[in-house]
């Protein structure tokens, strides 16, 4: 989500630190900053591009420093501005910290530290780390960081420097990546290997719970109890361009592989005492209590995620959920009354039609709950409540990990609505438990990548596809068809499986494959009959089904299995498969899936 760089050594110039930080620009960010110790201890940070930061430092770029840390920020707590940019400092301005991740218990820590006399200058969760290290510091920076991280809950990668410790960076990792290496007279760490490659190709990847002491000539790694750890050194053969993509050929491929982490990021801090928890909704639960109808507006992939939410909430409550494509809603007479709830979903928070739909709904008295990935975006600012996806920057035009993240937030929101309206039961407990366990299962799904690529090779030359599904399988079919259209330019259409006989089946023949989304759910046998109908028209069939479902054995065709889960969660479980199938076809056809023709990442015009 953010980018971290740390350097310690001799003969280093500030330009080296800034240039290394620029190697992380591809990750996306809204502000940047550095802290450095040379002839003096300084911090400089600015909202905007690294070029803005660099321009402000232009008189100092040739200044020498001994130790420095740098950061690109993607806002999660506090809007994007100079004050909230990293690094953050302690009260004495002796300690500087950069951080990637989310500190779940930062409010409790902040209250404790304020009672101890600490004064805060930002709205971020990160600043508590600097003050916590200050609170624990008694001359040993490692010891202070070890004590501090034991009090943190959530995900983090941090790098800490102290003005009185000129030869050391202390770094720690839990849930967010950090990699380090030693070059000629320089120790360097970063969020990924890209900034390291100018100095060394021999690197060590920190593991969860690791705390590292980095110096110019070496490093030590400890666990949080202060016991030394051994970590393998890897030799990296990537060049810098490949390293930006983590060694993957395309950003889209990398971002699909980040689906499990995106799910973790969306869930972190949002489950307490085995119940869904949204700090953002603390003062707005009345909005969702006793609601008899909820409206949803969104576009594209976000619309399909909204459909999943509709099915989920209507299957588990008596609440009606009406969902419309934003470009239609904004031009209709809105049947909205004072106090109605409208949920707006947009990765960028800048989708023009969704913004206009929100403005129309607000004129009629609706309260807006938005689900957004970009903090400080227009939709964020114009909403009553914003629930962030926390997926981090997504570079590829086609939504992948943000689809997973918005689904996760919508499931949690649905469960929260169930809880506050008296629908909480043992099945809700089961769904939440399986949702929390889902990241590990998504890792298992991604291990099927070679099989999916083989299937893509087999089907890449077809010119038409029909995706079908029932219930929760239908939004997945819609999203699968959209992915294929977006990046392969193959015509793909999606239907409710029960609609085949009402017209679409006339299209099917040996040159028109059917991609059937059919998890082992209450509608499985209905969908199975539609697949058999399709095969009787000689259509090639791909089935996306569930491991252990022996009824799939009766279907001859290509089958991809995913692990079993609660039937409402299959859209999450199956997302990586439909993404990888489309990605590999695009790649095998020699297309660039990161930049499909005629498409933009954020649709900011009508």
Swiss-Prot record:
<dbReference type="Pfam" id="PF13522">
    <property type="entry name" value="GATase_6"/>
</dbReference>
<dbReference type="InterPro" id="IPR035466">
    <property type="entry name" value="GlmS/AgaS_SIS"/>
</dbReference>
<dbReference type="InterPro" id="IPR046348">
    <property type="entry name" value="SIS_dom_sf"/>
</dbReference>
<dbReference type="GO" id="GO:0005829">
    <property type="term" value="C:cytosol"/>
</dbReference>
<comment type="subunit">
    <text>Homodimer.</text>
</comment>
<keyword id="KW-0032">Aminotransferase</keyword>
<keyword id="KW-0963">Cytoplasm</keyword>
<dbReference type="InterPro" id="IPR005855">
    <property type="entry name" value="GFAT"/>
</dbReference>
<feature type="active site" description="For Fru-6P isomerization activity">
    <location>
        <position position="601"/>
    </location>
</feature>
<dbReference type="GO" id="GO:0005975">
    <property type="term" value="P:carbohydrate metabolic process"/>
</dbReference>
<dbReference type="Pfam" id="PF01380">
    <property type="entry name" value="SIS"/>
</dbReference>
<keyword id="KW-0677">Repeat</keyword>
<dbReference type="GO" id="GO:0097367">
    <property type="term" value="F:carbohydrate derivative binding"/>
</dbReference>
<feature type="domain" description="SIS 1">
    <location>
        <begin position="284"/>
        <end position="423"/>
    </location>
</feature>
<feature type="active site" description="Nucleophile; for GATase activity">
    <location>
        <position position="2"/>
    </location>
</feature>
<dbReference type="InterPro" id="IPR017932">
    <property type="entry name" value="GATase_2_dom"/>
</dbReference>
<dbReference type="GO" id="GO:0006002">
    <property type="term" value="P:fructose 6-phosphate metabolic process"/>
</dbReference>
<dbReference type="InterPro" id="IPR035490">
    <property type="entry name" value="GlmS/FrlB_SIS"/>
</dbReference>
<protein>
    <recommendedName>
        <fullName>Glutamine--fructose-6-phosphate aminotransferase [isomerizing]</fullName>
        <ecNumber>2.6.1.16</ecNumber>
    </recommendedName>
</protein>
<dbReference type="InterPro" id="IPR029055">
    <property type="entry name" value="Ntn_hydrolases_N"/>
</dbReference>
<dbReference type="InterPro" id="IPR047084">
    <property type="entry name" value="GFAT_N"/>
</dbReference>
<dbReference type="GO" id="GO:0006487">
    <property type="term" value="P:protein N-linked glycosylation"/>
</dbReference>
<dbReference type="InterPro" id="IPR001347">
    <property type="entry name" value="SIS_dom"/>
</dbReference>
<comment type="function">
    <text>Catalyzes the first step in hexosamine metabolism, converting fructose-6P into glucosamine-6P using glutamine as a nitrogen source.</text>
</comment>
<keyword id="KW-0315">Glutamine amidotransferase</keyword>
<feature type="domain" description="SIS 2">
    <location>
        <begin position="455"/>
        <end position="596"/>
    </location>
</feature>
<dbReference type="GO" id="GO:0004360">
    <property type="term" value="F:glutamine-fructose-6-phosphate transaminase (isomerizing) activity"/>
</dbReference>
<dbReference type="GO" id="GO:0006047">
    <property type="term" value="P:UDP-N-acetylglucosamine metabolic process"/>
</dbReference>
<keyword id="KW-0808">Transferase</keyword>
<feature type="domain" description="Glutamine amidotransferase type-2">
    <location>
        <begin position="2"/>
        <end position="217"/>
    </location>
</feature>
């Amino acid at each position: 989500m953010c980018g971290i760089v740390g350097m310690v050594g001799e003969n280093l110039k500030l330009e080296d630190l800034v240039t290394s930080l620029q190697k992380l620009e591809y990750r996306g960010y809204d502000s940047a900053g550095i802290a450095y110790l040379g002839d003096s201890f300084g911090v400089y940070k600015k909202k905007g591009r690294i070029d803005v930061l660099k321009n402000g430092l232009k008189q100092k770029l040739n200044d020498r420093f001994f130790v420095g840390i740098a950061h690109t920020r993607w806002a999660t707590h506090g809007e994007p501005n100079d004050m909230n940019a990293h690094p953050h400092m302690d009260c004495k301005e002796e300690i500087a910290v950069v951080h990637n991740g989310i500190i779940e218990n930062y409010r409790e820590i902040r209250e404790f530290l304020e009672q101890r006399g600490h004064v805060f200058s930002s709205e971020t969760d990160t600043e508590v780390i600097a003050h916590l290290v200050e609170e624990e510091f008694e001359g040993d920076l490692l010891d202070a960081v070890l004590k501090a991280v034991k009090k943190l809950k959530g995900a983090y990668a941090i790098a800490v420097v102290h003005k009185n410790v000129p030869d050391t960076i202390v770094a720690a990792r839990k849930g967010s990546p950090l990699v380090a290496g030693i070059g000629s007279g320089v120790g360097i760490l970063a969020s990924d290997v890209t900034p390291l490659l100018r100095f060394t190709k021999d690197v060590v990847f920190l593991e969860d719970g690791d705390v590292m002491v980095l110096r110019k000539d070496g490093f030590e790694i400890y666990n949080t109890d202060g016991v030394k750890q051994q970590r393998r050194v890897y030799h990296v053969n990537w060049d810098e361009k490949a390293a930006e993509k983590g060694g993957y050929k395309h950003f889209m491929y990398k971002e699909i592989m980040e689906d499990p982490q995106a799910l973790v990021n969306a869930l972190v801090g949002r489950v307490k005492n085995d119940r869904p928890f949204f700090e953002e909704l603390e003062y707005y639960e009345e909005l969702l209590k006793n609601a008899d109808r909820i409206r949803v507006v969104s576009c594209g992939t976000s619309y399909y995620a909204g459909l999943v939410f509709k099915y989920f909430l209507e299957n588990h409550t008596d609440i009606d959920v009406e969902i419309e494509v934003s470009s239609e809603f904004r031009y209709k007479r809105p049947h909205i009354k004072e106090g109605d709830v409208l949920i707006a979903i947009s990765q960028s928070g800048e989708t023009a039609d969704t913004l206009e739909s929100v403005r129309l709904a607000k004129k009629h008295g609706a309260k807006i709950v938005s689900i957004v990935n970009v903090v400080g975006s227009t939709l964020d600012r114009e909403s009553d409540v914003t629930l962030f996806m926390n997926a981090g920057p997504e570079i590829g035009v086609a939504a992948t990990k943000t689809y997973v993240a918005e689904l996760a937030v919508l499931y949690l929101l649905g469960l929260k609505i169930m809880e506050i309206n008296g629908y909480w039961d043992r099945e809700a407990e089961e769904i939440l438990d399986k949702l929390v366990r889902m990241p590990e299962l998504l890792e298992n799904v991604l291990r099927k990548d070679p099989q999916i690529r083989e299937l893509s090779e087999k089907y890449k030359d077809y010119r038409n596809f029909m995706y079908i599904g029932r219930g929760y399988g239908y939004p997945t079919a819609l999203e699968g068809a959209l992915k294929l259209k977006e990046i392969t330019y193959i015509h793909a259409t999606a239907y409710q499986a029960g609609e085949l006989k009402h017209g679409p089946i006339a299209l099917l023949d040996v040159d028109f494959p059917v991609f059937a989304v059919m998890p082992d759910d209450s509608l499985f046998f209905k969908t199975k009959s539609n697949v058999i109908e399709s095969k009787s028209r000689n259509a090639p069939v791909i089935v996306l089904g569930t491991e252990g479902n022996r009824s799939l054995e009766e279907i001859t065709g290509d089958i991809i299995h995913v692990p079993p889960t609660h039937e409402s969660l299959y859209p999450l479980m199956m997302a990586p498969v439909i993404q990888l199938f489309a990605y590999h076809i695009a790649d095998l056809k020699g297309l660039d899936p990161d930049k499909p023709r005629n498409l933009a990442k954020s649709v900011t015009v009508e």
